[in-house]
């Protein structure tokens, strides 16, 4: 949502989700060069995190919300009984420097991290920025983020509202099909 109201990208996402429900076929996922780089570097970052912290990262794929089956997340790993891992491997060295100095990566991905904490029921997430181009001791920026219950409540309400909007679009399209 922007200052002036819902963003165009939100509307586009709702239409995409409605079409996926209607057709049963998922939309192709977009991946740019920076996203590909992040996916390729993630195992290195995970290994560096494990070596630095001594924590063993449990790999996990996709997690659905226990009572809202239209909500799911894919954290980069589970940590112990209460933690998550979210890794970013920025292509920009300046972004990694900012993460080292100000933990900006945790703020930039706040909603993603809070969503992961909400869906998994975990209590905290280590938000990691990793850049192997930096010298030893500066390749990892780790910032621990804890659950923000008011933010999670707002996220839950927004997801429920979005699901109702998607259902309305699907209903409208099904009505058009029956009328034809």
Segments predicted by a language model, with ranges:
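Charged, glycine-rich intrinsically disordered N-terminal tails and low-complexity linkers that flank
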Residues: 1-43, 103, 177-180
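Nucleic-acid nuclease catalytic cores
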Residues: 53-75, 79-169
């Amino acid at each position: 949502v922007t200052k002036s109201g819902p963003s165009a990208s939100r509307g586009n996402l709702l239409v995409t989700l409605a079409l996926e429900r209607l057709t049963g076929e998922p939309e192709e996922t977009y991946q740019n060069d920076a996203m590909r780089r992040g996916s390729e570097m993630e195992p290195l970052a995970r290994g560096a995190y494990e070596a630095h912290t001594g924590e063993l990262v449990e790999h996990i794929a996709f997690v659905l919300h226990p009572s809202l089956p239209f909500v799911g997340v894919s954290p980069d790993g589970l940590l112990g009984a209460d933690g998550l891992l979210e890794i970013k491997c920025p292509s920009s060295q300046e972004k990694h420097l900012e993460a080292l100095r100000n933990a900006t990566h945790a703020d930039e991905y706040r909603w993603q991290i809070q969503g992961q904490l909400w869906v998994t029921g975990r209590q905290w997430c280590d938000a990691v920025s990793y850049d192997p181009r930096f010298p030893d001791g500066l390749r990892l920026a780790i910032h621990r983020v804890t659950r923000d219950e008011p933010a999670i409540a707002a996220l839950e309400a927004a997801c429920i509202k979005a699901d109702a909007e998607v259902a309305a679009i699907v209903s409208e399209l099904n009505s058009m099909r029956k009328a034809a």
